[in-house]
């Protein structure tokens, strides 16, 4: 594919991260048209939402719309090989290969991969037998982390709680469950652009995953986040590069596994004998809500340049420039999130001062200009500022511009690093 200044771009996904990516790409005069499979109620104002019946249909539509670049930010299409299908059709793709996507698709595969790489991670017990699992937890120290299927991660504090989760998990799938000790420390989300054997780290982010203030309640995909989470030395960043990302890419290359996209490492920083050490918790092979919305405002380069350099395997030609500002994001969620669905609710949105931040539309639908909630994390309030405290104030000011029945959000995002005594 020749370079041009007239790109048709396809984004595969329908959450807040896709809206965030499109919002930035739309500002690039080189982007001729934006298409979405399937998109959401917000993306239809930024481009064209396409009805995609199956993955072969996505390829057909991509050819019909003369797509120059496809960005896949949903997990399932990566796992099922959409990257390879589009590449076979001659389309440039920003997205992990099917084989690389196993790092996120299977907890069992990921733990074995990490162990072989010598990457520091929690010790673990793996089984698909309920009796074996129960025997293990009877002799284990709590809290424990139970990982089932690809996304279901639970922190449990007693045997009764663990039993219910194990029973439910092993009834749903033949995939083994992973049981780990809970690692106490400072958690970070580290996102990297990956072009086979090359990578570039984006600003560090801290995701507040628990549903309730004070980090209580169930785990979610993320109730808020802050960036940059640069509270550590350059030495720690080098450890993350050299002890987590480099061994991962070296093994992928040794296994002839192509990867041109995003790798997000969830890391916990633990103090060992007075030295800070990064331990890997999980991998994701795509941009994630809420990290994507939080770190993108810090990237001053045109996003199209990032995607093209990655997809072409030319990261060496990219010199990233990051803003000196801070960003905080707050998820505005439906009443029953994350345990069950909620009835659709009409959204009422007041004007936002764009000097202070912006809104990212997530699980929403739109009909004749009226927005309705269609899922759990409905809208994200993004605040920017010269300090983290200023970014926080702006994020919560913007959150108050949104109204819908049953809306809920955490009011303590950033408490781990700010002096919010009410929640510490």
Swiss-Prot record:
Its EC number is 6.3.4.13. Keywords: ATP-binding, Ligase, Nucleotide-binding, Purine biosynthesis. GO terms for biological process: 'de novo' IMP biosynthetic process; purine nucleobase biosynthetic process. One of its GO terms (molecular function) is phosphoribosylamine-glycine ligase activity. SMART domains: GARS_A, GARS_C. It catalyses: 5-phospho-beta-D-ribosylamine + glycine + ATP = N(1)-(5-phospho-beta-D-ribosyl)glycinamide + ADP + phosphate + H(+). InterPro entries: ATP-grasp (IPR011761), ATP_grasp_subdomain_1 (IPR013815), PreATP-grasp_dom_sf (IPR016185), PRibGlycinamid_synth_ATP-grasp (IPR020561), PRibGlycinamide_synth (IPR000115), PRibGlycinamide_synth_C-dom (IPR020560), PRibGlycinamide_synth_C_sf (IPR037123), PRibGlycinamide_synth_N (IPR020562). Pathway: Purine metabolism; IMP biosynthesis via de novo pathway; N(1)-(5-phospho-D-ribosyl)glycinamide from 5-phospho-alpha-D-ribose 1-diphosphate: step 2/2. ATP binds at residues 137-189. Belongs to the GARS family. NCBIfam families: purD. This is Phosphoribosylamine--glycine ligase. The gene is purD.
């Amino acid at each position: 594919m020749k370079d041009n200044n007239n790109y048709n771009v396809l984004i595969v996904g329908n959450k807040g991260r896709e809206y965030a990516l499109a919002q930035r790409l739309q500002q690039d005069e080189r982007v001729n048209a934006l298409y979405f499979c399937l998109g959401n109620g917000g993306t239809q104002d930024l481009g064209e939402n396409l009805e995609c019946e199956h993955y072969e249909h996505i390829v057909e539509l991509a050819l019909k719309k003369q797509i120059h670049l496809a960005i896949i930010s949903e997990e399932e299409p990566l796992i099922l090989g959409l990257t390879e299908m589009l590449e076979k059709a001659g389309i440039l793709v920003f997205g992990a290969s099917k084989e690389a996507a196993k790092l996120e698709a299977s907890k069992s595969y990921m733990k074995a991969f990490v162990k072989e790489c010598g990457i520091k991670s929690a010790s673990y017990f793996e089984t698909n037998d309920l009796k074996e699992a129960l025997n293990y937890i009877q002799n284990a120290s709590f809290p424990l982390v139970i990982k089932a299927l690809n996304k279901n991660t639970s922190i449990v504090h007693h045997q009764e709680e663990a039993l219910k989760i194990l029973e439910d998990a092993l009834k749903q799938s033949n995939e083994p469950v992973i049981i780990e000790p809970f690692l106490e420390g400072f958690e970070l989300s580290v996102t990297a652009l990956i072009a086979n054997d090359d990578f570039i780290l984006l600003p560090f982010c801290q995701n507040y995953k628990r549903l309730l203030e004070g980090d209580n309640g169930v785990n979610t995909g993320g109730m808020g986040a802050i960036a940059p989470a640069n509270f550590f030395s350059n030495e720690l960043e080098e450890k993350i590069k050299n002890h987590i990302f480099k061994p991962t890419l070296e093994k992928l290359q040794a296994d002839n596994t192509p990867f041109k996209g995003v790798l997000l490492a969830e890391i916990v920083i633990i103090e060992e004998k007075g030295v800070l050490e990064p331990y890997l918790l999980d991998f994701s092979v795509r941009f994630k809500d809420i990290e994507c919305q939080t770190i993108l405002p810090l990237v001053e380069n045109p996003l199209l340049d990032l995607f093209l350099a990655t997809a072409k395997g030319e990261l060496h030609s990219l010199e990233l420039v990051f803003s000196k500002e801070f960003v905080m994001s707050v998820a505005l969620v439906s009443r029953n999130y994350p345990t069950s669905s909620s009835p659709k609710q009409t959204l009422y949105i007041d004007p936002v001062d764009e000097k202070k931040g912006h809104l990212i539309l997530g699980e929403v639908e739109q009909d004749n200009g009226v927005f309705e909630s269609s899922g759990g994390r409905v809208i994200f309030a993004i605040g920017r500022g010269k300090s983290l405290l200023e970014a926080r104030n702006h994020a919560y000011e913007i959150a108050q511009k949104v109204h819908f029945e049953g809306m809920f959000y955490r009011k303590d995002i950033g408490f781990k690093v700010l002096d919010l005594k009410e929640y510490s």
